[in-house]
Amino acid sequence: DWHPISEQAGGGWTGWDWNERLFPDYRKFLSYLDEQGVKTTMNLHPADGVRPYEKKYQEFIGRAGIENGKTVEWQGSDKRYVKALFDTHLHPYVDEGVDFWWLDWQQWPKDKRLKDLDNVFWCNYIWFTDMENNGTKRPLLYHRWGGLGNHRYQIGFSGDSYIPWESLRFLPYFNSTASNVLYGYWSHDIGGHQSKRYGTPVEPELYTRAMQMGQYLPIIRSHSTKDPQLNKEPWAFDQTTQRRLSNVINGRYALVPYIYTMARQDYETGISLCRPMYYDYPETEEAYGMKEQYMFGDKMLIAPVTNPVDKESGLAAVKAWLPEGQWLEYETGTMLEGGQTVERLFSMDEYPVYVKAGSIIPYYGKVKNLSGPNQPVIVRVFPGGNEGDFLLYEDNGEDKNYVSEYAT
């Protein structure tokens, strides 16, 4: 909704000017979001190009050296076109407060002039490297998978998935095995993007379980299609579901010191935050068969709930394979012996997370925003094991100096 769509131009999703009916003073709006510590992204569909009604159309075609009066289709292999687009439309928005970009390319796969140039891969490259080469902000891009090697640039958008339990059940395997091609940052429309039948309401139990899994994924993000029945804001649900969703969000914020440290490890080693069991236990046969569980960093094992609760008991049964050694349930502290498969019933307020005995997990208290002053770090020690350590990583979270300026 940030930009208007001209039906005279054939509709579509592309636009470069702000919708002044919804945002009469967009600069003030961006400034307000910044004051609240909220990062801003804008959704772009570059394939339809730049149309004559855009305010900066004349400046754009002048810089690009293009004939006047027609829609200028995307030309990613034309350096002059790309530079003109960024200089006239994108860089000014960054200067005014846009923090990162969300691309959505779903049109023709190859460039129309260079037939071997993949449009998704190339869009990821040029948007990311433009951010890398201009300004002080740390580059961040959200877009589709562009093939092998594309992990260097974007956080992945997995597409407009359907909502059923089968989709949720596939995600642990999908997320963890993506690490085999170094693609550690998949982002999903948590709870699904669309129903198979328009107007089907969100199922609170399924959405809660999806969000609980999202708490233990590299990226937690909820999104859905334009359907009035698919509102996913916590306040759109009953009070019990609101409380559970709030617990997920607070729990995610609390784990940021652990997650951020593991993300730095991913950056340095290529070992993804979310990975299959056989990464950590390659010589154990069971590790190769457990497709519905995964390691979340070095210390935590996640066995997601991917089936609904029993209608009579209100509990869901989950099996988890625990490697050799001692493990503790993250929420209860219950000690369990490894080298076996355990099964337990979980209520809607519980989730199967196991921590290696001897682990040290840093976390925050209750926080509302990570953009403010540094939060006090609390340390939780899980007893057992022979020894335990954790090398905490921190940087300013904003600029490119993380390469050499950080604290451990």
Outline where the language-model segments fall.
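Catalytic-domain carbohydrate-binding cleft regions of carbohydrate-active enzymes
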Residues: 1-351, 355-356, 396-401
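Accessory, solvent-exposed terminal regions and/or long lumenal/extracellular loops of proteins
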Residues: 350-408
